[in-house]
Design a protein with these regions (language model features):
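A conserved beta-strand-to-alpha-helix junction within the catalytic ATP-binding
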Residues: 30-48
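Short beta-strand/loop element within the Bergerat-fold HATPase_c
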Residues: 94-106
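Conserved catalytic submotifs in the C-terminal HATPase_c
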Residues: 30-35, 52, 57-67, 104
Length: 220
């Protein structure tokens, strides 16, 4: 119990630090070409003990294929770790977590699928909102601060991709995100929505990205 609470607190602190970096006004991304399968395998190995303790089967991982993406490896490692952590939390003993990677033209689509209770249709639109506790939508005791999936969305968007969730309640859940396969044109401008739906801007140079992030405090 002590170990579980220590891990929960450590994850909460790390999530708050990640948000603090994003909200500081400027966030630097060091993007390069790398093999997404190496990242996914590394993330799975880092969670090996929890996977074994939960008697969960891992399917789809391969090092035989080389699929290159253009992004910051550290940020994508964090995204994949958060999504795998979420999958482990909601996969029952004897269940399965499945990784897949698919090339789609100028993008690569990465998915992490898990068997289990899934998410209700009513909850699906809200799972990426900050502080949303999807645990409640699954009839489980609330765990975590509801920050991990929101951080995933921000980091994937910063990397030039998109993220979505699909689910069949009572059967499975799948998180899917995309990443570019080539660097953007120097000086390319993009506009991404913040949580209120209003756009904020960031400018991307060839290797470094700077973001001006607007944070709106929410009061109960």
């Amino acid at each position: 119990l002590v170990s579980e609470e220590t891990g929960r607190l450590a994850r909460l602190i790390q999530n708050m630090l990640d948000l603090s970096k994003l909200e500081s006004g400027e966030y630097q991304v060091n993007a390069r070409m790398f093999n997404i399968w190496e990242t996914l395998t590394g993330v799975a190995l880092s969670a090996e003990q929890r996977i074994n303790d939960g008697m969960i089967d891992i399917d789809g991982l391969t090092m035989d294929e080389k699929v290159l993406v253009y992004a910051d490896p550290d940020l994508i490692h964090q995204v994949a770790y958060n999504l795998l952590d979420n999958a482990i939390k909601f996969t029952p003993a004897g269940g399965t977590i499945r990784f897949s990677v698919e090339k789609l033209g100028p993008e690569v689509e990465i998915s992490i699928w898990n068997s289990g209770q899934g998410i209700s249709p009513e909850a699906l639109p809200y799972v990426f909102q900050r502080f949303y506790k999807e645990d409640r939508s699954r009839g489980l005791h609330a765990r975590g601060a509801g920050l991990g999936l929101n951080i995933c969305k921000v980091l994937v968007n910063l990397s030039g991709g998109q993220i979505r969730v699909e689910s069949q309640q009572g059967e499975w859940c799948k998180f899917v995100f995309t990443l570019p396969t080539q660097p953007p044109n120097p000086g390319e401008m993009k506009r991404l929505p913040d949580e209120s739906g209003r756009p904020f801007c960031y400018s991307m140079a060839y290797k470094v990205l700077h973001i001006h992030f607007r944070y709106r405090q929410k009061w109960d």
